[in-house]
């Protein structure tokens, strides 16, 4: 609203200063009278006269002369003058906001450049309206609006002058890594990477490396001698011929491990352990003693014998079997003898001799008074 009031005020001042201000006002009034007096049918009529060339006003009083000649007629030059006045005023009103908007844009540019000059380190001061400014900044900001750094300037310079990198490499100068610091040269100890590799060079010299990689024959012999002195299986038990696969145990003689042949002093335990010829673990002699014979697997009655823990063919006699149970609140222990050659049953019962060599009565069952069951074996025992 203030802007419109300002424009209307300026229009009134211009009309006062202009010599033909009253004529333009009268032209507007005449144009409005013509529009209001026209009939509705004339609206859809020929309006080609709107596109005619606008002629300059012939002079003051032209509209009055046309009106005096004919009361109901409106001259064409007056309407053209009215249109020209309206267009000039409209153009003048539209040009003023454009000028103000242009001035506002210039102020924003000045503020932006002033802010860039305070934040950027390489900002170039530019003057507005000097005529030589093309509108392109020498150092334009990046996408985020911040000024470019020195590293980006160097990258742009290297892209503009590709021959400079070749000159640096020819002169032996280290090439800097883009976006970082240059890698130091390691000298003789490490390979010169010149920025082409991020792996650090070795810190030791080539002479020490050669000694470690290619040892001398004397050093190899010293290492071998030292390794031979060390025990191969330290902290573990020595292997015996019985546990090592593919080896045979020494032949067993008729003397047991505790005894010694005649004419030789008895050996001690330390000799068995520390001796290099004999194994560390003594092997038990499994050979049956002289004067005993084994029982055949198929006796005369046809029942095969399965030797095991319950049967020992080297011992003849009886074995004592017990049964413990409770009767009338008392614990009863009954025992009896069975031949050694018989099998041990889960259910206690009296068994007969299988080998026909076991004695009928032994010192264990000689004092038995009563048998658990009167079987033929018990009757035979007590009968005898």
Curated annotation (Swiss-Prot):
Swiss-Prot/TrEMBL keywords: Host cytoplasm, Host-virus interaction, Inhibition of host innate immune response by virus, Inhibition of host IRF3 by virus, Inhibition of host MDA5 by virus, Inhibition of host RLR pathway by virus, Interferon antiviral system evasion, Metal-binding, Phosphoprotein, Viral immunoevasion, Zinc
Q: Which residues carry this modification: Phosphoserine?
A: 68, 125, 192, 249, 257, 260
Q: List, alphabetically, the Pfam families matched.
A: zf-Paramyx-P (PF13008)
Q: Which cysteines are joined by disulfide bonds?
A: none
Compartment annotation: Host cytoplasm
> Main site of residence?
host cell
Compositionally biased region (Basic and acidic residues)? 7-20, 83-101, 150-168
The entry's Zn(2+) 2-binding residues are 341, 353, 355, 358
Q: Where is this region: Disordered?
A: 1-23, 38-317
Keyword Acetylation found: no
Q: Which GO molecular function annotations are given, in alphabetical order?
A: metal ion binding
Biological processes annotated in GO: symbiont-mediated suppression of host cytoplasmic pattern recognition receptor signaling pathway via inhibition of IRF3 activity; symbiont-mediated suppression of host cytoplasmic pattern recognition receptor signaling pathway via inhibition of MDA-5 activity
Quaternary structure note: Interacts with host IFIH1/MDA5 and DHX58/LGP2. Interacts with host IRF3. Interacts with host RIGI regulatory protein (via CARDs domain) and host TRIM25 (via SPRY domain); these interactions prevent TRIM25-mediated ubiquitination of RIG-I and disrupts downstream RIG-I signaling.
| More about this protein | The P/V/C gene has two overlapping open reading frames. One encodes the P/V/W proteins and the other the C/Y proteins.
What does the record say about domains? The C-terminal zinc-binding domain is involved in binding to IFIH1/MDA5. This domain is also involved in viral pathogenesis.
User: In which family does this protein belong, per the annotation?
Assistant: Belongs to the paramyxoviruses V protein family.
Q: What does this protein do?
A: Plays an essential role in the inhibition of host immune response. Prevents the establishment of cellular antiviral state by blocking interferon-alpha/beta (IFN-alpha/beta) production and signaling pathway. Interacts with host IFIH1/MDA5 and DHX58/LGP2 to inhibit the transduction pathway involved in the activation of IFN-beta promoter, thus protecting the virus against cell antiviral state. Also interacts with and inhibits host IRF3. Blocks the type I interferon signaling pathway by disrupting the RIG-I signaling pathway.
Q: What is this protein called?
A: Protein V
Q: Which organism is it from?
A: Sendai virus (strain Fushimi)
Taxonomic lineage is:
Viruses, Riboviria, Orthornavirae, Negarnaviricota, Haploviricotina
